Structures are given as structure tokens and as C-alpha cells.
């Protein structure tokens, strides 16, 4: 099952980078929970697909373009999948290259939880692993 979970998250990244928010939305469970990294400017968590998609729309509207560049392989522990990436943004908002690690819980082909970490080691600890 874990390789299928990795594929769900891979498809979500591909959809985001292609601007295909319909596919991204469908890969999120109706009850998905999104938690930003510590110190993120917008309060959270966001509970439910509609709240998550409103946050996504708000984030994406901040810049003319944004994309995720993977800087690690996907790895999985049971129903959880993690990947390290750089979120590159450009345009009318401040340009940035934010390095994050995302930890995702996937059930029945949909993402039910998303949590982001600035510190990769902290993300691994959340998975019960270490660097």
C-alpha cells in the first residue's frame, strides 16, 4: 500500500506544479487537515477540503508563479509519506525559495493530513525516524 500512497502525493505535487487545482483538490480527503510550519504567518490548522483549498488559493494568489522542486526522494512509513522540497515563488509578491519537508497521511487514495516542517530532522522525528 505504501507505494500507492507515494504515488498519491507525487500526483499532488505534479498537479500543483501544473496549476491543476481540480486534481489537487480531488487528491485531498473531504476531512483533510493542513498544518503549516511553526511560525507560518497565517493561523491554522485548516480543517476540511474547502478550508484547505481556500488557503491554497490565497497562497497561490500571492505570486505570479510558484512551484515545488523536490530535493529528496519520497519516503514512506506505513500510511505516512514525506518529501523534502523547495517552494519557489516569483512575481508580484516577494520572491522566495522556502525549504520545507512535508509529511502526509494517505488513506484510501486521498490525503487526510498535511503537515509542513522547516526542520527536516523534526519532520523525521514526527515519522519516528532520525537522520
Residue ranges and their predicted role:
Residues 1-131:
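C-terminal and inter-domain tail/linker signature
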